[in-house]
């Protein structure tokens, strides 16, 4: 997997290459780029798909001690990825992680031509739902993250409401989830990075100001929300679509937050339609 040296450390990324329009796909906490494994093959023939592994707990290379891994800090790293790879007019696709509103609030959206938000953190929904609150509570306790991720070695524990049970209707394949969880289960430095992110969420008032910054994005946008989401409220998807001046809104039935896991074919169809009928 290729690597990029960023201000916070070295990040891995996947890149299908090619001369087509660029689609950058981002994942959430305690995941990695493989979240999109069932979606990218349907795009890569026409689009260059870039998938960075963000330092959100599923990454395999610890960041530098003391690096800014707060929500705005990780948003700045996304902007660095786009700059280092000289990517312009990209279509930025997010699932679970809500960093888009931070990117625009920080004035870092100049390389983004189109935006796709799929069941992600928004407004003041940080940490999101019961799983998010449970993870932040663990991060505040000495040894809490080690215990929380140790519990997830037991596969039945992964379907509990306070862990991953509310994130998808069907279980995340064990191969994927084993890979997502292993870094935080085995590396104190990865847990340190994750703790920095989880405890680096700004106050509610600032989060709401960030969301308002999305009004300034003038490019085409698609908001695709899971109709049965238990973590990212469906109403948030509708509100995001109302904020974005050129947004289309769709709800995807039979899915919770992790639409790329629950309904990859339906999500791919919506993505391809959006990409075909809009220009960055």
Range-by-range predicted roles:
Residues 2-6:
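Short acidic-hydrophobic surface loop/beta-edge motif
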Residues 15-61:
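Conserved HGGG/HGGXW glycine-rich cap/lid loop of the alpha/beta-hydrolase fold
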Residues 7-15:
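A short loop-to-beta-strand scaffold at the N-terminal edge of the catalytic core in hydrolase folds
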């Amino acid at each position: 997997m290729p690597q990029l040296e960023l201000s916070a450390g070295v990040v891995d990324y996947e890149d299908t290459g090619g001369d087509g329009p660029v689609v950058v796909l981002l994942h959430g906490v305690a995941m990695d780029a493989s979240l999109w494994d069932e979606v990218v093959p349907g795009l890569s023939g026409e689009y260059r798909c870039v998938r960075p592994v963000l330092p959100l707990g599923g990454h395999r290379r610890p960041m530098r001690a003391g690096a800014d891994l707060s929500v705005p800090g990780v948003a700045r790293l996304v902007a660095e990825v786009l700059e280092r790879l000289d990517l312009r007019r990209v279509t930025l696709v997010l699932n679970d992680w809500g960093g888009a509103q931070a990117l625009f609030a920080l004035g870092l959206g100049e390389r983004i031509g189109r935006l796709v938000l799929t069941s992600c953190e928004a407004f003041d929904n940080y940490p999101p739902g019961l799983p998010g609150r449970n993870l932040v509570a663990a991060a505040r306790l000495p040894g809490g993250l080690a215990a929380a991720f140790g519990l997830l070695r037991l596969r039945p524990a992964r379907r509990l409401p306070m862990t991953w049970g509310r994130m998808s209707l069907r279980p995340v394949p064990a191969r994927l989830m084993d890979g997502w969880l292993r870094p935080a289960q085995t590396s104190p430095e990865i847990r340190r990075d994750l703790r920095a992110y989880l405890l680096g969420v700004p106050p509610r008032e600032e989060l709401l100001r960030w969301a308002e910054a999305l009004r300034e994005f003038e490019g085409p946008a698609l908001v695709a929300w899971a109709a049965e989401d238990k973590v990212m409220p469906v109403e948030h998807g509708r509100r995001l679509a109302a904020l974005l001046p050129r947004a289309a809104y769709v709800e995807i039935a039979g899915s919770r937050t992790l639409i790329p896991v629950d309904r990859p074919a339906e999500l791919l169809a919506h993505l391809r339609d959006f990409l075909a009928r809009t220009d960055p």
